[in-house]
């Protein structure tokens, strides 16, 4: 009965938002596309400085717009500048090179769960370093080639590196995407690929270790766990067995018109963030294609409506098919409703249906550097799980200085999927990101 009520509420909100919707600071011109970790995010760069016309890749255009949004910190000058300015100056010196761009962040998160299973600790504090780099190998105007790299390192502070609060609660929705599922990993090469641009950069090909969330179901407002929502259902379409993965594969982005884009990918379903490409030989792949329509740019009434389909072969879950739809619609006031709906067969994935609906405010109190968000997600597991799980999350991100943002986060986890008994727990959180 409760599950039916949640579905009805989500459906009504989805329809009402959808009907109303129809009708940080980096002055470069390099793409920074948010991504996810075992479901984030990460950052990816690609040079667009010699783009010959206005027909740009949708994700590249979004990244340029995001880079122009001012950080708008509360504290000026930066009181932490004495410690962080040397790193910033070093990064700036490197980034002045016409061929190399780098970026570094470190994100802390502390969570306390009010209710846990017997014998499970209530609190976890952890940190994650993200290092990104992009090397422009050549640019001939109509064609270009570049290498992109993402390295991450996660650490639990004061407790065992094996502990994962989300896993211990029995959640299938990944309540802390900064860690993802499983233990902390000290060093992971999450992304390492070659990008080849063709047709005056309307067509881009990617080959190497990739992240499917970068191409399928990516949201500019509902994706980056370092600065937006922490839970996994806000990181992509969780009915994808490969959602949040980092593995060997290939992807294509094609900008068909100034408003229509097509993305497609193939990825190894046995790959992992800490693994290499050797499992490609097992021939267990996921293939997916997404088509979407967008207008505007983030911060200027951005709208994006998309649909996608996928199929996969996995080692432990068998083969399956599925699809999904998603949207975000930024209003002039800064309020931005968004939603996702994913569906799948009983095989090939651990979650066969997920619904999410929420709203962001991208300039709360007129502050462009801050962000507020709230979302509600509900999932229906495939066979073998115990409960339908729902997560309500809300956060506020305050840009304290040009180098630091922080803010509270609250998650209500209702009936974790793999818990032995049904229960509800509130996760009280605080997050801080340092931008070098």
Labelled PLM ranges:
Residues 289-382, 394:
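Detector for outer-membrane/organellar transmembrane beta-barrel domains
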Residues 95, 135-139, 195-198, 209, ...:
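Residue-level signature of outer-membrane beta-barrel architecture
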Residues 104-110, 147-153, 205-209, 264-268, ...:
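Transmembrane beta-barrel strands of outer-membrane/channel proteins
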Residues 424-436:
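Outer-membrane beta-barrel "beta-signal"
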Residues 243-244, 275-283, 313-319, 343-354, ...:
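Solvent-exposed loop/turn segments connecting transmembrane beta-strands
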Residues 21-113, 118-120, 136-142:
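N-terminal periplasmic/intermembrane-space "pro-region" immediately following the signal or transit peptide
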Residues 100, 140-145, 201-205, 259-264, ...:
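Repeated loop/turn-to-beta-strand initiation elements of outer-membrane beta-barrel proteins
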Residues 161-193, 200-290:
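Surface-exposed coil loops of outer-membrane beta-barrel proteins
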């Amino acid at each position: 009965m409760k599950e039916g009520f949640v579905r009805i509420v989500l459906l009504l909100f989805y329809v009402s938002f959808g009907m109303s919707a129809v009708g940080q600071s980096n002055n470069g011109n390099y793409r920074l596309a948010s991504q996810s970790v075992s479901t984030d995010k990460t950052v990816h760069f690609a040079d667009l400085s010699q783009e010959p016309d206005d027909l740009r890749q949708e994700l590249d255009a979004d990244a340029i717009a995001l880079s122009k949004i001012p950080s708008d910190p509360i504290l000026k000058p930066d009181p932490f500048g004495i410690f962080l300015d040397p790193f910033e100056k070093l990064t700036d010196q490197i980034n002045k090179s016409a061929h190399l761009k780098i970026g570094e962040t470190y994100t802390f998160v502390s969570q306390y769960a009010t209710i846990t299973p017997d014998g499970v600790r209530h609190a976890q504090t952890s940190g994650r370093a993200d290092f990104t780099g992009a090397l422009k190998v050549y640019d001939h105007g109509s064609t270009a080639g570049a290498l992109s790299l993402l390295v991450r390192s996660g650490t639990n502070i004061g407790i065992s590196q094996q502990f994962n609060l989300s896993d211990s609660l029995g959640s299938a929705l990944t309540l802390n995407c900064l860690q993802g599922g499983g233990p902390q990993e000290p060093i992971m090469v999450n992304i390492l690929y070659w990008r080849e641009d063709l047709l005056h950069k309307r067509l881009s090909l990617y080959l190497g270790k990739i992240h499917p969330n970068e191409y399928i179901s990516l949201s500019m407002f509902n994706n980056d766990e370092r600065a937006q929502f922490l839970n996994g259902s806000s990181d992509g379409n969780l009915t994808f067995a490969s959602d949040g993965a980092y593995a060997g594969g290939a992807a294509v982005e094609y900008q068909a018109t100034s408003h229509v884009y097509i993305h497609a990918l193939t990825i190894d379903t046995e790959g992992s963030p800490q693994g290499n490409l050797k499992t490609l030989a097992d021939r267990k792949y996921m293939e997916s294609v997404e088509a979407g329509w967008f207008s505007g740019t983030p911060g200027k009434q951005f709208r994006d409506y998309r649909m996608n389909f996928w199929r996969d072969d996995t080692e432990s879950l068998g083969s399956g098919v599925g699809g999904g739809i998603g949207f975000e619609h930024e209003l002039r006031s800064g309020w931005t409703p968004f939603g996702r709906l994913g569906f799948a067969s009983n095989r090939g994935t651990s979650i066969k249906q997920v619904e999410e609906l929420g709203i962001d405010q991208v300039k709360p109190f007129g502050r462009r550097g801050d962000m507020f968000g709230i979302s509600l997600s509900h999932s229906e597991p495939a066979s073998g799980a115990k409960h339908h799980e729902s997560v309500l999350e809300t956060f506020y991100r305050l840009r304290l200085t040009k180098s630091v943002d922080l803010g509270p986060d609250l998650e209500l986890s209702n009936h974790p999927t793999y818990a032995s008994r049904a229960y509800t727990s509130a996760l009280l959180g605080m997050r801080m990101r340092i931008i070098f």
